[in-house]
């Protein structure tokens, strides 16, 4: 199997560890690269341009320094289209935030559940759709 490199943009270290462990349990070929926040993502993106070998980015919405909207805005303002989908993974259920994420270029917005089984199911949905069904 071809390994998948997934960017995980998450400021909370415990949340990041949980997501990384869960993604690896779902698919052992996933290599997770954790970036602390939106600013760290933009630094990574600029430094590694053109970015190759990344299958997917899973990004929290609310983070310090630059949040998920800030990342999408910078990419949009620079007419950048990443070669990989950016999935917003957030506990926000605010319809306006969800609509804004799509308008600004997010490929999907997936609710981040609190309960462990639902959390795993949400990540399985992301992996199954974006890394298996809808490969670019």
Give residue spans per PLM region:
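Conserved acidic segment of CheY-like receiver
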Residues: 3-23
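Acidic, metal-coordinating helix/loop segments flanking the phosphotransfer/catalytic sites
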Residues: 34-56, 120
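Active-site residues of response regulator receiver
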Residues: 59-60, 90
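Receiver (REC) domain active-site loop signature in two-component systems and cognate sites
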Residues: 63
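A short, hydrophobic beta-strand element within the central beta-sheet of small alpha/beta folds
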Residues: 83-93
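C-terminal output helix
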Residues: 114-126
